[in-house]
């Protein structure tokens, strides 16, 4: 039989053990490590609003933030976008909130590129974050931290704020139209715990304009001539297509033309697209007449996710061209007595081209100004005429070749010139040489006659 009071002693021992075990469990829970700075281990779905700061107990004094954007915010490169966030209470004296724009991990970035049709070889050439964005943060007593890391922007929030909405406005840089990537806008306190976040996708941009640098089409050029249309600023370029039409509704390929497209990527990441309508044949397509028109249609389709940014869907640019269909200019040189050479270049552009003379391989300058006249009334083509004085030379010498060259078309035609050869033999030496030749011939005839007469007299006397 147990001594009296032993039951009470066992109850006391049991109570002490329960208290000891309960204290150990509480201590273990309190010693759990806090979340790593800047990393949210248990992040909510985007756009769900406020989030409890990890490592803290639920309390009415807990600082939370709710951003109006939430979820994924799509925006256009070159345009501003804003995140407006409201704090649940004013931060305490020992609390500081920072707004940080941080890029996604590299593996996530690579995965995000593919759905938007980005170019793989641009992956390693992304512009640094500091050159992509220009920050304009409007907040009560907000200050821009110049020592912010290159991976993001840190903005200190005034500790005296009373919960009024705080706006963060970011402007993307126009010079990086083709930048690839997604970024997450985060709000976190000094301890690195995330309060709320929103994902921002800056990829899509419709073409700014479609323009044709020139509407001159040289049909029988020595190099393949082409009409060019440029569309600037469209991104991603894989969603931009173009088509050529002859006289409104006939495809260029069926009319005997070839087409080509080229993406021009500059050093700062811009992507411009050029389309070419090319005549690859030696002769002009039979369907071309002076009145033939060319229509170019560029269509840009917004990538998936940008439907709200571009509610009208596809963006279409139409360019109607009325080309000046040009044939190869003709250069002719002729002699005009008594001492002039005339060079005439026909079927040339009225504001383009000059004539250059050379004799025996050396450039000579004409004292006469070239004259331009239209081929016919209302024509857009002209004829260019220039006169060159040739000196009279009474001496006997070798022939000289005069060449008249049409300059200004070297990129289109290998050589445009006309030549004439002046033979300086006696018959082409001019009037003095003809007189001399007549005297010589007269003396020869007279001498021959005298020789015959003398021979006859001597023969008769014998």
Swiss-Prot record:
Q: Does the keyword section mention Transmembrane?
A: yes
Q: Which residues lie on this side of the membrane: Cytoplasmic?
A: 455-462
Q: Which UniProt keywords apply?
A: Glycoprotein, Membrane, Signal, Transmembrane, Transmembrane helix, Virion
Query: What is this entry's stated membrane topology?
Result: Single-pass membrane protein
Q: Ligase among the record's keywords?
A: no
Q: Where is the composition biased (Polar residues)?
A: 39-57
- All ranges on the Virion surface side of the membrane: 24-433
Q: Hey, what's the signal peptide range on this chain?
A: 1-23
Q: Which residues cross the membrane?
A: 434-454
Highest taxon in the source lineage:
Viruses
Location in or out of the cell = Virion membrane
Q: Which residues are glycosylated?
A: 66, 94, 136, 173, 249, 417
Stretches with biased composition (Low complexity): 29-38
Question: GO CC annotation: what is one?
Answer: membrane
Q: What segment(s) does the record annotate as region Disordered? A: 29-57
Family from the record: Belongs to the herpesviridae glycoprotein C family.
Q: What is this protein called?
A: Envelope glycoprotein C
Query: Which source organism?
Result: Psittacid herpesvirus 1 (isolate Amazon parrot/-/97-0001/1997) (PsHV-1)
């Amino acid at each position: 039989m147990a001594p009296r009071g032993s039951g009470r002693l066992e109850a006391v021992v049991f109570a002490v053990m329960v208290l000891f075990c309960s204290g150990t469990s509480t201590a273990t829970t309190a010693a759990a490590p806090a979340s790593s700075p800047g990393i949210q281990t248990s992040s909510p779905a985007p756009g769900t609003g406020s989030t409890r700061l990890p490592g803290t107990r639920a309390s009415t004094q807990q600082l939370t933030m709710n951003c109006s954007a939430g979820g994924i915010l799509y925006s256009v490169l070159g345009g501003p976008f804003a995140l407006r966030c409201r704090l649940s209470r004013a931060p305490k004296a020992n609390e500081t909130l920072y707004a940080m724009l941080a890029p996604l991990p590299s593996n996530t970035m690579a995965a995000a590129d593919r759905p938007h049709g980005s170019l793989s070889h641009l992956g390693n050439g992304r512009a640094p974050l500091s050159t992509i964005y220009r920050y304009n943060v409007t907040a009560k007593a907000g200050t821009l931290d110049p020592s912010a890391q290159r991976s993001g922007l840190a903005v200190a929030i005034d500790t005296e704020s009373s919960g009024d909405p705080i706006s963060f406005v970011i402007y993307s840089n126009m010079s990086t139209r083709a930048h690839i990537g997604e970024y997450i806008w985060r709000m976190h306190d000094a301890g690195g715990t995330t309060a709320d976040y929103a994902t921002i996708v800056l990829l899509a941009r419709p073409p700014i304009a479609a323009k044709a640098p020139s509407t001159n089409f040289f049909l029988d050029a020595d190099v393949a001539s082409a009409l060019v249309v440029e569309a600037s600023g469209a991104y991603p370029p894989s969603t931009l297509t173009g088509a050529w039409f002859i006289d409104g509704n006939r495809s260029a390929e069926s009319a005997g033309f070839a087409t080509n497209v080229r993406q021009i990527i500059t050093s700062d990441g811009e992507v411009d697209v050029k389309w070419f309508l090319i005549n690859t044949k030696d002769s002009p397509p039979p369907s071309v007449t002076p009145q033939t028109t060319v229509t170019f249609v560029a269509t840009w389709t917004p990538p998936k996710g940008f439907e709200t940014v571009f509610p009208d869907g596809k963006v279409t640019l139409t360019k109607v061209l009325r080309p000046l269909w040009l044939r190869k200019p003709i250069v002719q040189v002729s002699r005009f007595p008594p001492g002039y050479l005339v060079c005439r270049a026909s079927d040339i552009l009225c504001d383009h081209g000059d004539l250059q003379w050379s004799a025996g391989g050396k450039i000579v300058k004409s004292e006469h100004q070239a004259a331009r006249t239209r081929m016919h009334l209302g024509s857009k083509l002209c004829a260019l005429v220039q006169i060159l004085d040739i000196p009279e030379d009474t001496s006997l010498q070798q022939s000289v070749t005069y060449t008249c060259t049409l300059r200004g078309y070297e990129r289109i035609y290998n050589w445009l010139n006309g030549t004439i050869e002046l033979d300086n033999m006696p018959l082409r030496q001019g009037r003095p040489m003809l007189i001399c030749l007549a005297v010589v011939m007269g003396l020869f005839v007279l001498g021959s006659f005298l020789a015959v007469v003398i021979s006859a007299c001597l023969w008769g006397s014998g």
